[in-house]
């Protein structure tokens, strides 16, 4: 019913919408909206596929399949990461970055981050973080998974993604507290993933790498901070580009959270946008909300550099980078409330089950939901996999 509502609102709004596509849009309005709806169809297909696999394999085998995919992605990402340190060929990269023009990895005086085969380091972390609880569920049965779990955790740490690290720590802590209160018994194994993450952070310190500065003769035309690596915009920029992984991740968290939620730049931008717009009851439709947001985003993020107005993502369709805000503008208060009620019922059911498997799937889901505050705006493959695994838990019950 929820996905049907999203689809209906989008189709109704699309019929009466007069599209004004950004300059660098790569598809027509019809194609763009169709892709949004196809994404919903793909989301349903993944849930169905995971559930259908249970007709051929037991639950733990399905989780092993998913975890092995995560291990493989992690290993490939680490190979890519070390290619810049030990100077061997990285994988071919032919897709644009978030800025739209190139995927910048090797930049003078910038710290090396683990991209893997993704467009952004945070995309890699968002994809891997939900798999960590599944790995440690398997580790309760076979100790070898403790060792294998180091690979995705190290890959996340070297991505230096605050979204991945914060969501993983808070998600597991939240689930651990709830299960401790419910069972009146603290299980140390529940927080082992956090211990592994902290350990990997210190290991990652020895694997940090900063690209060397350019020759001084190249500045100008290049900016001074590319020829002198001791120049930083502020303390946050200094922490971000520190070779120390611990400083890069955890000091940045401290500096950002001092400013409250508005310390996260994207949330600050979204707060300003919400305050400008009328209350959304039924929403603007999937994709259409992004088209409406893009001009305002340009206005909110433009900068005056030496008397010239510079836009962050000129001529592009901009992402909300927040699922909940995207749902609010795409499907209105009605759609957002339906989604939150659905999630609450799922989490409540897992909590009431209270068993070991429910804990790890609960953690998996909470990690995903936390990441949606800071990264990604669409119903993702990992969320579909998580819901599919939950259906296996509820297979003989009415969800």
Q: Locations of the language-model features?
A:
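Transmembrane signal-anchor hairpin modules in multi-pass inner-membrane enzymes, especially those
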Residues: 1-18, 64, 143, 185-190, ...
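Hydrophobic transmembrane alpha-helices and their immediate junctions
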Residues: 173-177, 181, 185-186, 316, ...
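Alpha-helical transmembrane segments of multi-pass inner-membrane proteins
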Residues: 63-93, 105-110, 115-181
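N-terminal hydrophobic segments of proteins, predominantly signal-anchor/transmembrane helices
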Residues: 1-46, 366-368
